[in-house]
């Protein structure tokens, strides 16, 4: 029976004079010769408990055997600490518990690392012993916030008339984007299920089924290369609505995010959110998820570059590329040539061949390429960039994609390095008017920029066959502080329109029927117009909790190589299991 009075981290002055019962883990033990002090910890925090022979000699005797991470139960009286030993850094810092009775519930071996807020243990060790890592206060607080976010989501959507509906985890493999995780069928020999990359098709079928408003906090799976903000399995807040347009979905989503920020962070955010088209985002920031907490926009200088005799600039423009610049205000004295060389190496990570630069001084432009700027060119540069004396101007000339990627990431790096970002600011932003298609140069074909079920803008339907690169989607992404928080669209709900989309993507009628025939059939039976959005829950928790990567906000995450150090998954299985699944392994040159 849980007979606790309260949690350790909630014992404050309101309990003074009361006899209470606490249970938790021993964080620290200090023996002062006759008195023993223990910091007792649970998920809500720590409280100091005192073993004093004046209160209980028996409890003191037991306390002499207690060590770190023992699980104990204590009975005692809450008293005020002496003023000299008050700890203002913790909620319970003004009180302590004088123990009259203690029970050792379970002992602990010495843990492989110190279980404290700050630890110098490697991440691999902490992931191997994740259940110990989860005891640390920063992670405990993070998962408390995760719960608060999902509670706010459920409360808001329930009040707004949404049904929470579960969709299948074992489903059909379809060519939607990343590689699928496949699950072999024992019963249907040689056939496979796939774990869902998203519930996209099922939530559309729910709209056809008349559910009107659906949501789900759902696990999704993508077998793709990992990075700091990616995991092979992740959780998204999945939403779909019938009889809506883009404005309806965006407004609903703003209301939900406003509720989350108020309930979880105590912050009132302004709605509606600012909006920016995809074209504006790429023009001014070089990226489709701009961090608008600081300025330093990219400036396109193709007109100026075409007038100059600098071959690097002129050649980039003539070959259909671009010349863009960013202005680092007041940085001409802060960055030496060596510092700028380091920035150049960073830009090269994103494909740039080099990083040109000039400094604006009393005597005009100064730097390796200053000689290529005639007086009129220099004047035009300063007008275009609004650069002033003391500023540093950085240029990249290359293909549009390289220029944008290198300067966008360089801008973000400089924003952090120079302290231009207010870390307490939450800048939400909509990016709209997305291209419907993306072109893959290597494969020489178009792909859906979001997914094949996104509706094109009505006025662009006729261009599906003739000008794919100009077709815009009824799609919208919500961005927070330079991260894509979620994305959505108005869906195709007409069979003929969906056929046109598949055709534009290079599907034959047979391929479309094979992969998506069940959806096409559903469109025959009165599909309502519908749209929705999906937001990354893990990423939202990461951003609101100030954590640096997704592994910190998932209870049992995978490593960068998609392994679980705790359970050693993935692992080999018995030959008998493979035989039952009709699978033979063909692994060459594999070492594991």
From Swiss-Prot:
It is found in: Cytoplasm. It catalyses: tRNA(Asp) + L-aspartate + ATP = L-aspartyl-tRNA(Asp) + AMP + diphosphate. ATP binds at residues 222-224, 231, 484, 536-539. Residues 200-203 are annotated as: Aspartate. It is an enzyme of class 6 (ligase). Its main location: cytoplasm. The keyword Nucleotide-binding applies. Pfam families: GAD, tRNA-synt_2, tRNA_anti-codon. GO terms for cellular component: cytoplasm. This is Aspartate--tRNA ligase. Its EC number is 6.1.1.12. GO terms for biological process: aspartyl-tRNA aminoacylation. One of its GO terms (molecular function) is ATP binding. Keywords: Aminoacyl-tRNA synthetase, ATP-binding, Cytoplasm, Ligase, Nucleotide-binding, Protein biosynthesis. CDD domains: AspRS_core (cd00777), EcAspRS_like_N (cd04317).
